[in-house]
Amino acid sequence: GSIPACGESCFKGKCYTPGCTCSKYPLCAKN
């Protein structure tokens, strides 16, 4: 798997950094 590299946590299932998703819950990861 890839390493989360978005520097934020999921918030209510969403990530606010462009190109990032909550696929590595509870962390955001590059989509």
Curated annotation (Swiss-Prot):
Entry keyword Transcription: no
Swiss-Prot/TrEMBL GO biological process terms: defense response
Signal peptide: none
The entry's keywords: Disulfide bond, Plant defense
Protein's UniProt keywords contain Disulfide bond: yes
Listed Pfam families: Cyclotide
InterPro entries to which the protein is assigned, alphabetical: Cyclotide (IPR005535), Cyclotide_sf (IPR036146)
SUPFAM superfamilies listed in its UniProt record: Cyclotides (SSF57038)
Record PTM: This is a cyclic peptide.
UniProt cross-link Cyclopeptide (Gly-Asn), position: G1-N31
Disulfide bonds: C6-C20, C10-C22, C15-C28
Job of this protein: Probably participates in a plant defense mechanism.
Domain notes: The presence of a 'disulfide through disulfide knot' structurally defines this protein as a knottin.
Membership in a protein family: Belongs to the cyclotide family.
Designated name of the protein: Cyclotide vinc-B
Species this chain originates from: Viola inconspicua
